[in-house]
Amino acid sequence: MKLLNDSRMQEFIVNGYVKVKAAFTPAFHESVRAQVEEIFSTTGNPGNDILPAIPQLADLFSHPAVTGALTSILGPGYAMHPHRHCHLTPPRQAGQRHHQDSYEDDQNVRHHRTRWVMAFYYPQDVNVEMGPTSVLPASQYYTRRDQAEKQEEVLLSGEAGAVTIVHYDLWHRAATNHSDRNRYMIKFLFCRMAEPNAPSWQCASPVWSEPAAYEELPRLWRSVWNWHLGNELRDDGQDDASRVGVSAGRRDNGLRVEQEVLSEAGQLENVYQLSGQGPKGSAELCERLSKEALELLDHNQAARHTNPSQLYSGFGLSAQGATAVPYLLELLRTGDWPLRAAVADILGDIGRPAGNAVPFLIDSLDDDSEWVRRNAAEALGNIGSAEPVPQLARLLVKDSCRFVRHNAALSLAKIGRDADAASSSLQMALDDTNLYVRENARLALARIHME
Protein backbone atom coordinates (compact mmCIF):
# COMPACT_ATOMS: atom_id res chain seq x y z
CA MET A 1 0.00 0.00 0.00
CA LYS A 2 1.39 3.39 -1.00
CA LEU A 3 0.31 5.95 1.59
CA LEU A 4 0.28 9.68 0.96
CA ASN A 5 3.03 11.77 2.53
CA ASP A 6 2.52 14.98 4.52
CA SER A 7 2.72 17.19 1.45
CA ARG A 8 0.10 15.27 -0.49
CA MET A 9 -2.19 14.97 2.53
CA GLN A 10 -2.03 18.72 3.04
CA GLU A 11 -2.63 19.16 -0.68
CA PHE A 12 -5.84 17.16 -0.29
CA ILE A 13 -6.98 19.21 2.72
CA VAL A 14 -6.50 22.48 0.83
CA ASN A 15 -7.42 21.55 -2.75
CA GLY A 16 -10.02 18.89 -2.02
CA TYR A 17 -8.58 16.27 -4.35
CA VAL A 18 -5.50 14.18 -5.04
CA LYS A 19 -4.63 12.17 -8.17
CA VAL A 20 -3.11 8.70 -8.21
CA LYS A 21 -2.47 6.14 -10.94
CA ALA A 22 -3.71 2.55 -10.91
CA ALA A 23 -0.79 1.29 -12.98
CA PHE A 24 -2.28 -1.84 -14.49
CA THR A 25 -1.47 -2.82 -18.06
CA PRO A 26 -3.12 -0.81 -20.86
CA ALA A 27 -5.04 -4.00 -21.69
CA PHE A 28 -6.72 -3.92 -18.25
CA HIS A 29 -8.12 -0.44 -18.73
CA GLU A 30 -9.04 -1.08 -22.37
CA SER A 31 -10.97 -4.15 -21.26
CA VAL A 32 -12.93 -2.04 -18.77
CA ARG A 33 -13.61 0.65 -21.38
CA ALA A 34 -14.78 -1.88 -23.95
CA GLN A 35 -17.12 -3.54 -21.47
CA VAL A 36 -18.55 -0.17 -20.43
CA GLU A 37 -19.12 0.73 -24.08
CA GLU A 38 -20.86 -2.59 -24.71
CA ILE A 39 -23.11 -2.19 -21.66
CA PHE A 40 -24.14 1.32 -22.65
CA SER A 41 -24.88 0.29 -26.22
CA THR A 42 -26.99 -2.73 -25.24
CA THR A 43 -28.68 -2.15 -21.88
CA GLY A 44 -27.90 1.46 -21.01
CA ASN A 45 -26.27 2.92 -17.92
CA PRO A 46 -25.95 0.16 -15.29
CA GLY A 47 -25.92 2.60 -12.36
CA ASN A 48 -25.04 0.84 -9.11
CA ASP A 49 -24.64 -2.43 -11.01
CA ILE A 50 -21.48 -1.31 -12.82
CA LEU A 51 -19.36 -3.26 -10.31
CA PRO A 52 -21.14 -6.64 -10.62
CA ALA A 53 -21.29 -6.08 -14.39
CA ILE A 54 -17.50 -5.54 -14.56
CA PRO A 55 -16.02 -7.44 -11.59
CA GLN A 56 -12.44 -6.52 -12.51
CA LEU A 57 -13.19 -3.01 -11.25
CA ALA A 58 -12.72 -4.49 -7.77
CA ASP A 59 -9.06 -5.02 -8.69
CA LEU A 60 -8.76 -1.30 -9.38
CA PHE A 61 -9.70 -0.48 -5.80
CA SER A 62 -7.24 -3.04 -4.47
CA HIS A 63 -4.34 -1.32 -6.23
CA PRO A 64 -1.72 -0.12 -3.69
CA ALA A 65 -1.82 3.48 -4.94
CA VAL A 66 -5.61 3.64 -4.62
CA THR A 67 -5.89 1.84 -1.27
CA GLY A 68 -3.01 3.94 0.05
CA ALA A 69 -4.68 7.22 -0.86
CA LEU A 70 -8.05 6.12 0.52
CA THR A 71 -6.50 4.83 3.75
CA SER A 72 -4.53 8.05 4.16
CA ILE A 73 -7.66 10.17 3.84
CA LEU A 74 -10.39 7.97 5.40
CA GLY A 75 -8.37 5.85 7.79
CA PRO A 76 -8.07 2.06 7.87
CA GLY A 77 -11.22 0.01 7.45
CA TYR A 78 -13.01 2.49 5.18
CA ALA A 79 -16.01 1.14 3.26
CA MET A 80 -17.08 1.31 -0.37
CA HIS A 81 -20.61 2.70 -0.52
CA PRO A 82 -23.13 0.72 -2.64
CA HIS A 83 -23.91 3.77 -4.78
CA ARG A 84 -21.75 4.12 -7.90
CA HIS A 85 -22.27 5.59 -11.33
CA CYS A 86 -20.72 5.53 -14.78
CA HIS A 87 -20.74 8.94 -16.46
CA LEU A 88 -20.80 9.13 -20.26
CA THR A 89 -20.06 12.38 -22.07
CA PRO A 90 -20.72 11.69 -25.77
CA PRO A 91 -19.07 13.64 -28.59
CA ARG A 92 -20.04 17.33 -28.77
CA GLN A 93 -22.09 17.20 -25.58
CA ALA A 94 -22.06 20.50 -23.72
CA GLY A 95 -20.53 20.66 -20.27
CA GLN A 96 -22.40 20.75 -16.99
CA ARG A 97 -22.71 23.56 -14.51
CA HIS A 98 -20.45 23.31 -11.46
CA HIS A 99 -22.23 21.55 -8.62
CA GLN A 100 -21.79 19.59 -5.40
CA ASP A 101 -23.10 16.03 -5.39
CA SER A 102 -25.98 15.16 -3.13
CA TYR A 103 -25.39 12.48 -0.52
CA GLU A 104 -26.93 9.24 -1.64
CA ASP A 105 -30.28 8.68 0.04
CA ASP A 106 -29.75 11.26 2.77
CA GLN A 107 -29.30 15.02 2.68
CA ASN A 108 -26.26 15.16 4.94
CA VAL A 109 -24.83 18.41 6.23
CA ARG A 110 -21.70 19.31 4.29
CA HIS A 111 -18.92 18.87 6.80
CA HIS A 112 -15.31 19.99 6.63
CA ARG A 113 -13.94 16.87 8.29
CA THR A 114 -13.34 14.10 5.78
CA ARG A 115 -15.75 11.22 6.27
CA TRP A 116 -16.84 10.82 2.64
CA VAL A 117 -14.91 10.89 -0.63
CA MET A 118 -15.54 10.04 -4.27
CA ALA A 119 -13.14 8.31 -6.62
CA PHE A 120 -13.23 9.29 -10.31
CA TYR A 121 -11.69 6.65 -12.60
CA TYR A 122 -10.90 6.99 -16.30
CA PRO A 123 -10.76 3.66 -18.20
CA GLN A 124 -9.32 5.47 -21.24
CA ASP A 125 -6.92 8.32 -21.91
CA VAL A 126 -8.80 11.61 -21.49
CA ASN A 127 -7.36 14.82 -22.88
CA VAL A 128 -8.78 18.33 -22.50
CA GLU A 129 -10.70 18.03 -25.79
CA MET A 130 -12.69 15.05 -24.51
CA GLY A 131 -14.51 16.90 -21.75
CA PRO A 132 -12.71 15.67 -18.65
CA THR A 133 -14.13 16.15 -15.20
CA SER A 134 -13.43 19.68 -14.04
CA VAL A 135 -12.93 20.71 -10.41
CA LEU A 136 -12.72 24.01 -8.58
CA PRO A 137 -9.76 23.47 -6.22
CA ALA A 138 -10.24 24.55 -2.60
CA SER A 139 -14.01 24.91 -3.11
CA GLN A 140 -15.11 21.97 -0.93
CA TYR A 141 -15.65 24.11 2.16
CA TYR A 142 -18.09 26.46 0.43
CA THR A 143 -21.83 26.03 -0.06
CA ARG A 144 -22.32 29.19 -2.12
CA ARG A 145 -21.74 29.03 -5.86
CA ASP A 146 -20.47 32.61 -6.08
CA GLN A 147 -17.72 31.83 -3.56
CA ALA A 148 -16.82 28.46 -5.11
CA GLU A 149 -16.54 29.89 -8.61
CA LYS A 150 -13.89 32.36 -7.50
CA GLN A 151 -11.53 29.39 -7.63
CA GLU A 152 -9.72 28.70 -10.90
CA GLU A 153 -11.07 25.67 -12.76
CA VAL A 154 -8.80 22.65 -13.28
CA LEU A 155 -9.54 20.05 -15.98
CA LEU A 156 -8.64 16.57 -14.74
CA SER A 157 -7.18 15.13 -17.92
CA GLY A 158 -5.18 11.94 -17.55
CA GLU A 159 -4.12 8.58 -18.89
CA ALA A 160 -6.16 5.40 -18.59
CA GLY A 161 -5.94 4.32 -14.97
CA ALA A 162 -6.03 7.84 -13.55
CA VAL A 163 -7.99 7.89 -10.28
CA THR A 164 -8.81 11.17 -8.57
CA ILE A 165 -9.83 10.98 -4.91
CA VAL A 166 -12.18 13.90 -4.23
CA HIS A 167 -13.59 15.42 -1.04
CA TYR A 168 -17.30 14.72 -1.35
CA ASP A 169 -18.26 18.39 -1.30
CA LEU A 170 -15.81 19.63 -3.93
CA TRP A 171 -17.50 21.65 -6.69
CA HIS A 172 -17.05 19.89 -10.03
CA ARG A 173 -18.63 19.30 -13.45
CA ALA A 174 -18.23 17.40 -16.69
CA ALA A 175 -16.62 19.70 -19.25
CA THR A 176 -17.70 19.93 -22.91
CA ASN A 177 -16.58 17.01 -25.07
CA HIS A 178 -15.17 18.65 -28.21
CA SER A 179 -13.88 15.34 -29.58
CA ASP A 180 -15.51 12.61 -31.67
CA ARG A 181 -15.05 9.96 -28.95
CA ASN A 182 -17.12 8.90 -25.96
CA ARG A 183 -15.64 9.91 -22.63
CA TYR A 184 -16.32 7.61 -19.67
CA MET A 185 -15.71 8.28 -16.00
CA ILE A 186 -16.73 5.78 -13.34
CA LYS A 187 -17.54 7.22 -9.91
CA PHE A 188 -17.33 5.30 -6.65
CA LEU A 189 -18.15 6.49 -3.13
CA PHE A 190 -16.22 5.68 0.05
CA CYS A 191 -17.03 6.27 3.71
CA ARG A 192 -14.86 6.60 6.82
CA MET A 193 -15.78 3.96 9.40
CA ALA A 194 -13.77 5.16 12.41
CA GLU A 195 -12.75 8.56 13.74
CA PRO A 196 -9.03 9.34 13.51
CA ASN A 197 -6.86 8.78 16.58
CA ALA A 198 -3.50 8.99 14.79
CA PRO A 199 -2.24 9.88 11.30
CA SER A 200 -3.25 7.25 8.74
CA TRP A 201 -0.80 8.49 6.11
CA GLN A 202 3.02 8.51 6.05
CA CYS A 203 3.37 11.33 8.57
CA ALA A 204 6.87 12.71 9.11
CA SER A 205 5.85 15.88 10.95
CA PRO A 206 2.66 17.12 12.64
CA VAL A 207 3.44 20.70 11.60
CA TRP A 208 1.03 22.32 9.14
CA SER A 209 2.63 24.13 6.18
CA GLU A 210 0.69 27.10 4.83
CA PRO A 211 -0.09 26.60 1.12
CA ALA A 212 1.48 28.96 -1.38
CA ALA A 213 -1.49 29.11 -3.76
CA TYR A 214 -4.32 29.95 -1.33
CA GLU A 215 -4.64 32.02 1.80
CA GLU A 216 -8.34 32.44 2.61
CA LEU A 217 -8.97 29.61 5.12
CA PRO A 218 -5.84 29.13 7.28
CA ARG A 219 -7.62 28.35 10.55
CA LEU A 220 -10.02 25.92 8.87
CA TRP A 221 -7.18 24.03 7.18
CA ARG A 222 -5.20 23.75 10.42
CA SER A 223 -8.29 22.51 12.24
CA VAL A 224 -8.95 19.80 9.65
CA TRP A 225 -5.26 18.80 9.67
CA ASN A 226 -5.26 18.46 13.45
CA TRP A 227 -8.43 16.40 13.31
CA HIS A 228 -6.81 14.01 10.82
CA LEU A 229 -3.81 13.78 13.17
CA GLY A 230 -6.17 12.63 15.92
CA ASN A 231 -5.63 15.83 17.90
CA GLU A 232 -8.02 18.42 19.27
CA LEU A 233 -5.52 21.23 18.81
CA ARG A 234 -6.82 24.66 17.96
CA ASP A 235 -5.05 27.89 17.14
CA ASP A 236 -5.46 30.78 19.55
CA GLY A 237 -7.70 32.83 17.28
CA GLN A 238 -5.57 35.93 17.80
CA ASP A 239 -4.79 36.75 14.17
CA ASP A 240 -5.73 40.21 12.99
CA ALA A 241 -9.36 40.46 11.89
CA SER A 242 -8.31 41.57 8.42
CA ARG A 243 -7.02 38.05 7.76
CA VAL A 244 -10.45 36.54 8.19
CA GLY A 245 -12.50 38.84 5.99
CA VAL A 246 -14.32 40.86 8.66
CA SER A 247 -14.23 44.51 9.60
CA ALA A 248 -12.65 45.00 13.01
CA GLY A 249 -15.61 46.70 14.70
CA ARG A 250 -16.14 46.62 18.48
CA ARG A 251 -14.95 43.70 20.57
CA ASP A 252 -16.04 42.67 24.04
CA ASN A 253 -13.02 41.13 25.78
CA GLY A 254 -11.64 40.24 22.36
CA LEU A 255 -14.62 37.99 21.63
CA ARG A 256 -17.68 39.67 20.15
CA VAL A 257 -17.22 41.18 16.73
CA GLU A 258 -19.65 43.58 15.13
CA GLN A 259 -18.74 42.21 11.77
CA GLU A 260 -19.44 42.76 8.16
CA VAL A 261 -18.83 39.42 6.53
CA LEU A 262 -17.15 40.11 3.22
CA SER A 263 -17.35 36.58 1.85
CA GLU A 264 -18.28 33.05 2.76
CA ALA A 265 -14.57 32.46 3.34
CA GLY A 266 -14.56 35.31 5.84
CA GLN A 267 -17.59 33.94 7.63
CA LEU A 268 -15.97 30.53 7.95
CA GLU A 269 -12.69 31.93 9.21
CA ASN A 270 -14.58 34.03 11.75
CA VAL A 271 -16.32 31.02 13.32
CA TYR A 272 -13.01 29.13 13.39
CA GLN A 273 -11.48 32.13 15.13
CA LEU A 274 -14.20 31.98 17.76
CA SER A 275 -13.59 28.25 18.17
CA GLY A 276 -10.17 29.05 19.63
CA GLN A 277 -11.58 31.22 22.41
CA GLY A 278 -12.70 28.59 24.88
CA PRO A 279 -15.99 28.78 26.79
CA LYS A 280 -16.54 32.39 25.73
CA GLY A 281 -16.31 31.25 22.14
CA SER A 282 -18.77 28.43 22.86
CA ALA A 283 -21.30 30.86 24.29
CA GLU A 284 -20.95 33.23 21.33
CA LEU A 285 -21.20 30.45 18.77
CA CYS A 286 -24.24 28.90 20.47
CA GLU A 287 -25.94 32.28 20.49
CA ARG A 288 -25.29 32.60 16.78
CA LEU A 289 -26.40 29.01 16.18
CA SER A 290 -29.75 29.66 17.88
CA LYS A 291 -30.39 32.56 15.52
CA GLU A 292 -29.11 30.83 12.39
CA ALA A 293 -31.22 27.72 12.97
CA LEU A 294 -34.41 29.75 12.56
CA GLU A 295 -33.24 32.53 10.23
CA LEU A 296 -31.77 30.14 7.64
CA LEU A 297 -34.45 27.46 7.88
CA ASP A 298 -36.49 28.52 4.85
CA HIS A 299 -33.34 29.06 2.78
CA ASN A 300 -31.91 25.67 3.74
CA GLN A 301 -35.14 23.86 2.88
CA ALA A 302 -35.83 25.72 -0.37
CA ALA A 303 -33.63 23.60 -2.64
CA ARG A 304 -33.41 19.86 -3.19
CA HIS A 305 -30.75 17.81 -1.41
CA THR A 306 -30.34 20.30 1.43
CA ASN A 307 -30.29 19.93 5.19
CA PRO A 308 -31.80 22.47 7.63
CA SER A 309 -28.74 22.04 9.85
CA GLN A 310 -26.33 23.60 7.31
CA LEU A 311 -25.24 26.45 9.61
CA TYR A 312 -21.93 28.32 9.74
CA SER A 313 -21.70 28.44 13.54
CA GLY A 314 -21.75 24.65 13.64
CA PHE A 315 -18.30 24.45 12.09
CA GLY A 316 -16.80 26.54 14.88
CA LEU A 317 -18.52 24.46 17.55
CA SER A 318 -17.31 21.23 15.93
CA ALA A 319 -13.76 22.57 15.94
CA GLN A 320 -14.04 23.29 19.68
CA GLY A 321 -14.57 19.64 20.49
CA ALA A 322 -15.36 18.74 24.10
CA THR A 323 -15.35 22.40 25.19
CA ALA A 324 -18.59 23.03 23.30
CA VAL A 325 -20.49 19.94 24.47
CA PRO A 326 -22.09 21.32 27.68
CA TYR A 327 -23.35 24.38 25.80
CA LEU A 328 -24.73 22.23 23.00
CA LEU A 329 -26.52 19.88 25.39
CA GLU A 330 -28.42 22.80 26.87
CA LEU A 331 -29.67 23.71 23.37
CA LEU A 332 -30.53 20.07 22.65
CA ARG A 333 -32.78 20.09 25.72
CA THR A 334 -34.45 23.47 25.16
CA GLY A 335 -34.36 24.40 21.47
CA ASP A 336 -36.98 24.21 18.74
CA TRP A 337 -36.61 21.30 16.31
CA PRO A 338 -34.32 23.11 13.81
CA LEU A 339 -31.93 23.91 16.64
CA ARG A 340 -32.15 20.41 18.14
CA ALA A 341 -31.40 18.90 14.73
CA ALA A 342 -28.39 21.19 14.28
CA VAL A 343 -27.03 20.35 17.72
CA ALA A 344 -27.36 16.60 17.08
CA ASP A 345 -25.42 17.03 13.86
CA ILE A 346 -22.67 19.09 15.50
CA LEU A 347 -22.23 16.56 18.31
CA GLY A 348 -21.75 13.91 15.65
CA ASP A 349 -19.19 16.04 13.84
CA ILE A 350 -17.29 16.47 17.10
CA GLY A 351 -17.18 12.68 17.30
CA ARG A 352 -15.56 10.82 20.20
CA PRO A 353 -14.92 13.94 22.33
CA ALA A 354 -18.73 14.28 22.51
CA GLY A 355 -19.04 10.98 24.37
CA ASN A 356 -20.85 12.65 27.28
CA ALA A 357 -23.67 13.47 24.88
CA VAL A 358 -24.54 9.84 24.11
CA PRO A 359 -27.45 9.51 26.61
CA PHE A 360 -28.97 12.74 25.31
CA LEU A 361 -28.60 11.67 21.68
CA ILE A 362 -30.25 8.35 22.57
CA ASP A 363 -33.21 10.33 23.88
CA SER A 364 -33.22 12.27 20.61
CA LEU A 365 -33.85 9.05 18.69
CA ASP A 366 -37.46 9.36 19.90
CA ASP A 367 -37.81 13.00 18.88
CA ASP A 368 -40.96 13.96 16.97
CA SER A 369 -38.79 15.60 14.31
CA GLU A 370 -37.50 13.33 11.56
CA TRP A 371 -34.49 15.62 11.14
CA VAL A 372 -33.52 15.32 14.79
CA ARG A 373 -33.77 11.52 14.63
CA ARG A 374 -31.78 11.40 11.38
CA ASN A 375 -28.97 13.55 12.72
CA ALA A 376 -28.91 11.84 16.12
CA ALA A 377 -28.71 8.39 14.52
CA GLU A 378 -25.79 9.50 12.37
CA ALA A 379 -24.04 11.23 15.28
CA LEU A 380 -24.04 8.12 17.45
CA GLY A 381 -22.12 6.20 14.80
CA ASN A 382 -19.37 8.82 14.69
CA ILE A 383 -19.04 8.83 18.47
CA GLY A 384 -18.76 5.05 18.32
CA SER A 385 -20.06 4.03 21.74
CA ALA A 386 -21.85 0.69 22.08
CA GLU A 387 -24.39 2.20 24.50
CA PRO A 388 -26.98 3.14 21.83
CA VAL A 389 -26.92 -0.24 20.03
CA PRO A 390 -30.35 -1.41 21.33
CA GLN A 391 -31.99 1.89 20.43
CA LEU A 392 -30.40 2.01 16.97
CA ALA A 393 -31.50 -1.59 16.38
CA ARG A 394 -35.08 -0.66 17.31
CA LEU A 395 -34.97 2.37 15.03
CA LEU A 396 -33.67 0.25 12.18
CA VAL A 397 -36.78 -1.93 12.07
CA LYS A 398 -39.47 0.38 13.44
CA ASP A 399 -38.86 3.94 12.23
CA SER A 400 -41.13 4.91 9.34
CA CYS A 401 -38.50 7.22 7.82
CA ARG A 402 -36.07 5.45 5.50
CA PHE A 403 -33.43 8.13 6.11
CA VAL A 404 -33.48 7.38 9.82
CA ARG A 405 -33.19 3.64 9.12
CA HIS A 406 -30.36 4.35 6.67
CA ASN A 407 -28.39 6.28 9.28
CA ALA A 408 -29.13 3.76 12.02
CA ALA A 409 -27.75 0.93 9.89
CA LEU A 410 -24.62 2.88 8.94
CA SER A 411 -23.99 3.81 12.57
CA LEU A 412 -24.27 0.17 13.61
CA ALA A 413 -21.72 -0.61 10.90
CA LYS A 414 -19.36 1.99 12.36
CA ILE A 415 -19.80 0.62 15.87
CA GLY A 416 -18.84 -2.75 14.38
CA ARG A 417 -18.20 -5.76 16.62
CA ASP A 418 -19.67 -4.02 19.65
CA ALA A 419 -23.01 -3.91 17.80
CA ASP A 420 -23.45 -7.68 17.91
CA ALA A 421 -26.68 -7.31 19.91
CA ALA A 422 -28.23 -5.68 16.84
CA SER A 423 -27.59 -8.70 14.59
CA SER A 424 -31.19 -9.91 14.50
CA SER A 425 -32.48 -6.44 13.63
CA LEU A 426 -29.82 -6.14 10.95
CA GLN A 427 -30.89 -9.49 9.51
CA MET A 428 -34.46 -8.18 9.34
CA ALA A 429 -33.21 -5.02 7.64
CA LEU A 430 -31.83 -7.10 4.78
CA ASP A 431 -35.47 -7.18 3.60
CA ASP A 432 -36.00 -3.42 3.94
CA THR A 433 -37.78 -1.73 1.03
CA ASN A 434 -34.83 0.65 0.59
CA LEU A 435 -31.68 -0.52 -1.20
CA TYR A 436 -29.26 1.54 0.88
CA VAL A 437 -30.78 0.46 4.19
CA ARG A 438 -30.31 -3.15 3.05
CA GLU A 439 -26.74 -2.56 1.95
CA ASN A 440 -25.78 -0.67 5.12
CA ALA A 441 -27.25 -3.53 7.16
CA ARG A 442 -25.20 -5.99 5.11
CA LEU A 443 -22.08 -3.91 5.78
CA ALA A 444 -22.85 -3.79 9.50
CA LEU A 445 -23.24 -7.56 9.71
CA ALA A 446 -19.96 -8.05 7.86
CA ARG A 447 -18.13 -5.72 10.24
CA ILE A 448 -19.70 -7.27 13.33
CA HIS A 449 -18.57 -10.75 12.33
CA MET A 450 -15.24 -9.94 10.67
CA GLU A 451 -12.21 -11.74 12.05
Task: Name every feature range the model reports, one short phrase each.
Residues 1-109:
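Non-heme Fe(II)-dependent double-stranded beta-helix
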Residues 94-157, 200:
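Catalytic core of non-heme Fe(II) oxygenases with the double-stranded beta-helix
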Residues 158-172:
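Conserved metal-binding segment of the jelly-roll/cupin
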Residues 175-259, 263-274, 278, 310:
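Non-heme Fe(II)/2-oxoglutarate
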Residues 227-248, 265-280, 299-322, 327-330, ...:
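Structural detector for internal amphipathic alpha-helices that build alpha-solenoid repeat scaffolds
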Residues 256-261, 284-304, 327-335, 360-368, ...:
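Alpha-solenoid HEAT/Armadillo-like helical repeat scaffolds in large eukaryotic proteins
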